[in-house]
Amino acid sequence: MRIAPLLALALLAAAPAAAQQATYTNPILYADYSDPDLIRVGDEYFMVASSFHFSPGIPVLKSRDLVHWSIVGHVLPRLPFGPLFDMPGPHTLDDTISRPTGGTKYAGGVWAPSIRHHDGKFFVYWATPDEGVFMATATDPAGPWSEAVHVIAAPGLEDPCPFWDDDGTAWLIHGRVGAGPLILHRMSADGKRSLDDGIVVAEDKEKLPVLEGPKLYKRNGWYYIFAPIGGVERGPQAVGRARDIRGPYDWRTVLEPGTTPIQGPHQGGWVETPSGQGWFAHFNSTGAFGRIVHLQPLLWQGDNWPVVGKPVPGQNYGQPVASHAMPDTGNAPTTDRLQDSDEFASAQLGLQWSWNHNPLDGAWSLAERPGWLRLEAQPAQHLVTARNTLTQIMQGPRPSFTTRLDVARMAEGQRAGLTLFGVRPSWIGVVREGGRNRIVLASEGVETVGPELAGQTVELRAEVSESQSVRYSYSQDGSTFTPFGDPIWLARFSWWKGSRPALFSFTRGASGTADFDWFRVERREP
């Protein structure tokens, strides 16, 4: 007689759980992890993204639920591609000119890496636009990674992706700088050498304009090339398929902006969960926040074509979802998050940090003053030509960055502070001139002098708005912050990257040091 009441209680208990099915909201990473690619190994997921001229290169992210990610390592401890990655000069740019013609490698470095797992090892491939195609391997995605291997030594290549067929044959697909044709090569079984000059497998300037970023897969006997078309700002995602890996490929658009505000939802990677769900991670260009990462469901139709996002009635493509049920990964949703704040209490920098170009290792330290980051100023006339600017990827949409600076060891002509780094950067900091330390606000190379610093420490803050402007302020007592100047618009395009919060020190005179106690990030609510 108690069966019915017990069943009713069980149903009541289950109802809220069903009604409260976990969901996620796009973007999953409001951060500039451009050209993302991802894989699943076991019940874990790994992602890589473009890092361009920042060092260490190629961040490796990890997730258990496909939505929450953290950084676990980098493929490249330094950028080994040539001396210009050490910013030797002579420099032809300044804080108002964005396109260098020598002395640096802005916009060079790592373009559009791919990650795969084969024969018990992780493989990452990438191109540098002036040097060619490279790869590295590791047994643990957190590292250590092997030294970079030059797979194809030729300029003008981009966006490589390896593929091992069922019989072990290794292939490599890539594009050309300028969104040229997609080219397929045979590779040695270990993936370290291209065995031929390659064949063009896709090129159609009218139907497939700006074809780039290919990812090569196989499913149900079909070979698939996932590739964006139409350009970064507005292009859709296309897929080509063929029975023979060499083609010919038939092409179809699988993800369009549709009626959503998400323009240019493309370039990324496909992954399946253990339950067979398909998911596609891609970027969306946002200006100063860079190319942020969205996650779309991917559904395979009965005709073996994929549709990405929410299917559009009567069409062969989908459109981006704003929110969706969490992926069925078999894992509970996590609370993992991208690292940001740093108290500089460790013997090593946090994984969230990367230098503008390769650092001068003898000119920075976490050991000389334990608990502080010390930057020894190197000669430079402009922030964009200064060595050892320490950056991290900005996480939107309303971040605030605060640091404490000790100026006691600064020298005449030295500058140090907090910047939103990019093309035509702005910064707030301290300049020592005439034996005095003054708070200064700079924008596009123009310095506005503020009050003299009363003590030897000052807290500096940068608050970024969702509309992509920054407001700087400072505090001499650690509690009351005084705004300095009007909001400054951030550059919407900075050498293929978004604007980045960064700590810096350089000198137009003598060489001193700047000490930073901590760097704290607050993600502000609307």
Spans of features found by a protein language model:
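Bacterial N-terminal signal peptides
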Residues: 4-14
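Carbohydrate-active catalytic/glycan-binding domains of CAZyme proteins
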Residues: 19-526
